[in-house]
Each structure stands twice: as C-alpha cells, then as structure tokens.
Amino acid sequence: MPRSQRNDNFIDKTFTIVADILLRIIPMAPGEKEAFTYYRDGMSAQSEGEYAEALQNYYEAMRLETDPYDRSYILYNIGLVHTSNGEHTKALEYYFQALERNPSLPQALNNTALICHYRGEQAIRQGDPETAEAWFDQAAEYWEQAIALAPGNYIEAQNWLKITGRFGE
C-alpha cells in the first residue's frame, strides 16, 4: 500500500488530500503524476524519520521526473535526508545538484552554509583555527546568497554575519 494511503498525521493527511486533488485537476503527463506520487511518499517517510524509505521514493521520483525545477526539490530533499543521517559530504553533493538546476533555492544555500559552519566548529575543537576560518568564510558566502534570495529569513545567520564582521564582505 502506498505510504500516502496510510498516513496518521493530520498535516500529512491534509497534504495528501490536496495533492491528490491537484493531481486530478492539473494537466500533466502520467510520468509526472507518478513522479509526484513518489516525491509525496518520500516526504511523508522523511517526516516520520523513515529515511531509507524516503530515499527509495526520492530516487524513483528522480528516475521519472524530467523537469529540472521539480528535480531540484527532489535533490534538495535527498540532501536533507543525508544531512539528517550525518552524511554531510553526500548532502552537499545533492544541495549543489539542486542549486545547479534551481539557483534560487535559498534553503539549499542555507543548509550548505550550516554544514560549512559545523565543519568550522569541528576544526576549532580540533585546534585548527585556520581551517575553521576558511569554513566560516564559506558559510558566510552561502548565507549571504541565501539572505539575498530571502531577505526576511535566516535572521540567526544575519546576526552571526554581523557579529563576526562577515556581513557584506
């Protein structure tokens, strides 16, 4: 049984109902509908922490989806799963692929910045301030791009940029 038919979460059920209505009324090719169904099931599995199942659904959605913009969101969500699993290198690969297809994806830029910042903190703990600064500078670049795309978002990142003197460098 598809995951979308066994949701217990109210928000997931609501999303599923709205998505099913849209699938019926918006004209799209059968492959696109099937890709969206896998994407929706992947999001549902991901929200429940079922990451292996989410990845299976996202990979199937990628196989079927042809639109680069839609593929960017699938790739972004695959990156989220890898981030949740602590697989930051893999996550970055998927965030970069998402940004190649959709450069206006501030959440992918933000998550890339978060990983760079995390790596900077790791370098500090390991006693390597030069490497830490390089990671923090990279984080700043990605956050500035994300903030440029979504000025009202990422307030904590904006504060960090100001406090560390990296805002607008």
UniProtKB/Swiss-Prot annotation:
SMART domains in the cross-refs: TPR
InterPro entries named among the record's database cross-references: PSI_Ycf3_assembly, TPR-like_helical_dom_sf, TPR_rpt, Ycf3/AcsC/BcsC/TPR_MFPF
Keywords (A to Z) from UniProt: Chloroplast, Membrane, Photosynthesis, Plastid, Repeat, Thylakoid, TPR repeat
GO biological process, one term: photosynthesis
Membrane topology: Peripheral membrane protein
Start-end of each TPR repeat: 35-68, 72-105, 120-153
Gene Ontology CC terms, in alphabetical order: chloroplast thylakoid membrane
SUPFAM superfamilies (alphabetical): TPR-like
Cellular compartment(s): Plastid, Chloroplast thylakoid membrane
Chief location bin: plastid
Family (UniProt): Belongs to the Ycf3 family.
Role this protein plays: Essential for the assembly of the photosystem I (PSI) complex. May act as a chaperone-like factor to guide the assembly of the PSI subunits.
Protein's name according to its UniProt entry: Photosystem I assembly protein Ycf3
